[in-house]
Swiss-Prot record:
The gene is SIK2. The active site is at 148 (proton acceptor). One of its GO terms (biological process) is regulation of insulin receptor signaling pathway. Its EC number is 2.7.11.1. This is Serine/threonine-protein kinase SIK2. Residues 351-361, 673-685 have a biased composition (Polar residues). Phosphorylated at Thr-181 by STK11/LKB1 in complex with STE20-related adapter-alpha (STRADA) pseudo kinase and CAB39. Residues 302-342 form the UBA domain. Phosphorylates IRS1 in insulin-stimulated adipocytes, potentially modulating the efficiency of insulin signal transduction. Inhibits CREB activity by phosphorylating and repressing the CREB-specific coactivators, CRTC1-3.
Length: 798
């Protein structure tokens, strides 16, 4: 008996958006990966709301040997129950298709993590290797050999814990009965496999463990080559390089695992007792504790009564569930049991982790506090049951994913069918409601306020949201890779006062139209908090045209793997890949474009632009309250009242000054006196009026420019802006740099009747008025405090 996956009773969210495809009780969300005869989909269980990975296999494309291998993989996964091994939840089979529902690891492969972030520290590698070793030892204790251990098959869950996956090459073994199948990945394969000899399964896995540990610590492969014969020769020789940063204990452990003779190779028990592994004794205790917490050995009759009670409350027959667990049926009953058990563990761990309040966490409700204080055995099922009835948004699946799903597997999923047990109608016999009403899971007002499940929904809408307690270093390429199917990133560029803040802020990534305004508002709010009133928004197309970094070339038609060109086959360090270099090049390119091309020291004006943009609003408010400012006319563009600079931007004024400073590089200097009179005449003011205006204005001294002694400039709060004729005479860039090195800043306490003079060293000087002590005290608080002998001229060195 089969039924169509699309349920007509569930209304579509909109007329334009197609309904989500379903396989049994699972709503298909997106594609995780594709193969020659299989495709892996990300799905969500409709009852437990748990994300799972469904491997959909087209049996018509498999020969009998490969089909036997698939069945053996399912048989192996049914026997394995370990915290660091991917769990099997359900197996569904039709005439042509096979659906394998397994645990979903949210953080992907260890290979991608190393490619993005570089090699691990030895302490972090030790923690990960303990988890890997525990999983492999568990397999060997059940007489199962993996035979394909590599970083691509080591997945990372939401807590960055190891999950061993892909038992496609796994097999059962007996002690003393060697295996002979050539399988696995060549860089991780043992010498006996390259030689075509029979081998012991555990010895093969130990060699692969040595290669995995080397990759974790070094970020590259110990054995590599341009072709298979070269790689084979290097593996048979057993020679590899040890980097300078690897400790001696780690080196000895890897060398004992990578021994060419399998009989002399170290065993798992000896690995656990090695000095490098025992450097942190707490890790071994954590492994034993985490393994003891796995409390479902269902086929042995060890059931979780609390989970069974929750299922019975939901209307699922308890007796049918127990029978499915005893027979290892892995049907809908067993899948709901296993998924509910995982949800219960997550709920308990979240209650424990939410006890220490943080700045981002909201105050828990009284019911949550009471549940957290209760023992685990006495935890009621009402809270978890209500969370299971939380309604998911109907617009979870993007139209592009739906279109992609329509063409997968040469239409084996059109329409998608799933098998149903003949006695399935007794599943909800203890409930007065219909199955469709249970699947629709109506929302109650109490459940709407469950913050944990709201966070879970937000985590799905933004799958790469980085928690604050993690140490992962996500690059811009990784962000772009995960969102190539959604809206392009909106990158906000602002004038920051601190150079350490970088040039670009975090990307405002939106995955749906409902969240776009919220994400954009939060990003802009973050810019306002940094004190940047003027921000320049740049689209992804502009970034792609301005930056040479290939990582910014967003290609929506390509998958995530296309943006990770670096592989261990190329023999490069993961930390030295183009991902990190691309991000650095992007920031350097933006800084380079923001700099002025010309005289030495012109780039210092960028610091002035940032300082003006950051503190203009606060300084204007303080200047408006100053009695000195009230007594002055609004005649300059930097006046606090802003009457003469309406419609003009501060940043534009600074850029205008940059252009003025680069004019007339070939003219000779003229005498100081004619230039002074010309300056006053050009401004339309007589010399006396010019001097009087300068006396009445205050100035802003940039201490940063004075310290560098490269470009001295004094701007008054109400002083006149330097005009282009100020720079009518100049010298070449080379000669100006030479004069700059010999120039001494000239500050005099004498009051000068003119506004600008020229020194005899061919350096341009702008003269500012003197101030008395009372006026200086009431001036701008950001003005540098000058002593009595420093009041007077301000020299502009060019």
């Amino acid at each position: 008996m089969v039924i169509m996956s699309e349920d007509a009773s569930v209304p579509a969210p909109s007329a334009a958006q197609p309904r989500p495809l379903r396989v049994g009780f699972y709503d298909i969300e997106r594609t995780l990966g594709k193969g020659n005869f299989a495709v892996v989909k990300l799905a969500r269980h409709r009852v437990t709301k748990t994300q799972v990975a469904i491997k959909i296999i087209d049996k018509t494309r498999l020969d009998p040997s490969n089909l036997e291998k698939i069945y053996r993989e399912v048989q192996i996964m049914k026997l394995l129950n370990h915290p660091h091994i991917i769990k099997l939840y359900q197996v569904m089979e039709t005439k042509d298709m096979l659906y394998i529902v397994t645990e979903f690891a949210k953080n992907g492969e260890m290979f991608d993590h190393l490619t993005s972030n570089g090699h691990l520290s030895e302490s972090e590698a030790r923690k990960k290797f303990w988890q890997i070793l525990s999983a492999v030892e568990y397999c060997h204790s059940h007489h199962i050999v993996h035979r394909d251990l590599k970083t691509e098959n080591l997945l990372l869950d939401a807590n960055m814990n190891i999950k061993l996956a892909d038992f496609g090459f796994g097999n059962f073994y007996k002690s003393g009965e060697p295996l002979s199948t050539w399988c696995g990945s060549p860089p991780y394969a043992a010498p006996e496999v390259f030689e075509g000899k029979e081998y012991e399964g555990p010895h093969l896995d130990i060699w692969s463990l040595g290669v995995v540990l080397y990759v974790l610590v070094c970020g590259s492969l110990p054995f590599d080559g341009p072709n298979l014969p070269t790689l084979r020769q290097r593996v048979l020789e057993g020679r590899f390089r040890i980097p300078y940063f690897m400790s001696e204990d780690c080196e000895t452990l890897i060398r004992r695992m990578l021994v060419v003779d399998p009989t002399k190779r170290i065993t798992i028990s000896q690995i656990k007792q090695h000095k490098w592994m025992q450097a942190d004794p707490s890790l071994r205790q954590q492994q034993s504790l985490s393994f003891s917490m796995q409390n479902y050995n269902s086929n042995l009759g060890d059931y979780n009564e609390q989970v069974l009670g929750i299922m019975q409350t939901l209307g699922i027959d308890r007796q049918r569930t127990v029978e499915s667990l005893q027979n290892s049926s892995y049907n809908h009953f067993a899948a709901i049991y296993y998924l509910l058990l995982e949800r219960l563990k997550e709920y308990r761990s979240s209650q424990l982790s939410s006890r220490p309040a943080t700045g981002r966490q909201q105050r828990p409700r009284s019911s949550e506090i009471s549940n957290a204080e209760m023992p685990q055995d006495s935890l009621t099922s009402e809270t978890l049951r209500s969370s299971l009835l939380y309604q998911q948004p109907q617009s979870l699946i993007q139209p592009s994913l739906q279109a992609e799903m329509d063409c997968d597997m040469n239409n084996p999923l059109q329409p998608v069918f799933f098998p149903v047990d003949p006695n399935f109608n007794g599943l909800f016999r203890n409930r007065s409601i219909s199955p469709s009403s249970l699947l629709e899971t109506t929302i109650s007002e109490e459940v709407r306020q469950e913050k944990e499940l709201e966070d879970e929904i937000k985590a799905y809408d933004h799958p790469i949201r980085i928690p604050s307690n993690t140490s992962r270093r996500h690059t811009l390429a990784e962000v772009t890779t995960h969102f190539y199917q959604h809206a392009p990133p909106c990158i906000v560029i602002s004038s920051s006062a601190s150079p350490t803040e970088g040039t670009s802020s975090d990307s405002c990534l939106t995955s749906s139209s409902n969240d776009s305004s919220v994400a954009l508002s939060s990003c802009l709010a973050g810019q306002v908090m940094t004190g940047s009133p003027a921000t320049a928004r740049m689209t992804s197309a502009f970034l792609a045209s301005q930056s040479d970094a290939p990582v910014l070339q967003v290609q929506g038609c390509m998958g995530g793997a296309s943006l990770l060109p670096v592989s261990f086959q190329e023999g490069r360090r993961a930390s030295d890949t183009s991902l990190t270099q691309g991000l650095k090049a992007f920031r350097q390119q933006l800084r380079k474009n923001a700099r002025a091309k010309g005289f030495l020291g012109l780039n210092k004006i960028k610091g002035f632009a940032r300082q003006v943009c950051q503190s203009s609003s606060s300084r204007a408010a303080r200047s408006a309250m100053s009695p000195f400012q009230h007594a002055q006319p609004n005649t300059c563009i930097y006046s606090s009242s802003g009457s003469s600079r309406e419609g003009r931007n501060l940043l534009e004024e600074v850029l205008q000054q940059q252009r003025m400073l680069q004019l007339q590089h070939h003219q000779l200097l003229q005498p100081a006196c004619p230039q002074t009179s010309q300056t006053s005449a050009t401004n339309g003011l007589p010399p006396s009026d010019s001097a009087g205006t300068c006396k009445a204005s205050n100035s802003l001294l940039l201490s940063e420019l004075q310290r560098e002694n490269s470009f001295e400039l004094a701007f008054g709060g109400n002083s006149q802006l330097l005009q282009p004729h100020f720079f009518g005479v100049s010298v070449s860039p080379v000669s100006s740099a030479a004069h700059l090195l010999d120039t001494h800043l000239y500050i005099s306490s004498n009051v000068s009747p003119v506004g600008t003079t020229f020194s005899q060293q061919q350096s341009f000087s702008a003269q500012s008025p003197s101030y008395d002590a009372v006026t200086l005290q009431h001036g701008d608080c950001e003005m540098e405090d000058l002593t009595s002998n420093q009041l007077g001229k301000f020299v502009l060195v060019k």
